[in-house]
Structure formats: C-alpha cells, structure tokens
Amino acid sequence: MFKDIITYELDDDVDEAYLLEIAGEIIESWMSKQPGFIQWDIHKDSIGEGYTDIVYWETREAAQEAEQQMGNIPNAADWFSCYKEGSIGSQNLQQLGSFK
C-alpha cells in the first residue's frame, strides 16, 4: 500500500463544512474512478488549525498516475481554493507492515 500525506491550512474564507462538501464531490466525480484508489481520510490537528489528508493507493504508480490526471478534475478550482496559499506540504509513504 502507498500513502500520500498532505498537510495544509484552510483558506480564511473556507470552513470545514465546505471542505468536506468539496471533498465528497471530488471523491464522487473523480478520485473514486482512479485505478488503485483505496480511500481518502481528512484529519484535523488538536488545536484545529492544521489539516492532514491521507490518501491510500494500491501502488506508488497508481498514485503517480492520478497525480498526472489532476488537471481533469471537474471542479479542481473549488478544491484548490480550500487551501491557504503556501501552506501545502506533502510526503509519500510506502507501507512495510501493519500490526493489530
């Protein structure tokens, strides 16, 4: 499994309800149709200022292919307008093991 970890702050004019609404639209219209997509989790930090999304993919290649297709997202401008300019960071993780 491969994970994209995206950190960000919301733009000043965006609230969490709008973020979740737009995320739902992105899932329905685009992301769920991407080969290798598993799930997208949105988290808020304990002080409520920073957000972290974890997007799960079957493989690194599936994640990279989806990234190349991001220009085809029907309402990409609405999605990207949620993020405060300059606040986005990302990293990628390859899962080695999982224990319960």
Identify the meaning behind each predicted range.
Residues 1-51, 58-71, 82-100:
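Short S/T/G/P-rich N-terminal loop/turn motif that feeds into the first structured element of a domain
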Residues 73-77:
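A common structural junction motif
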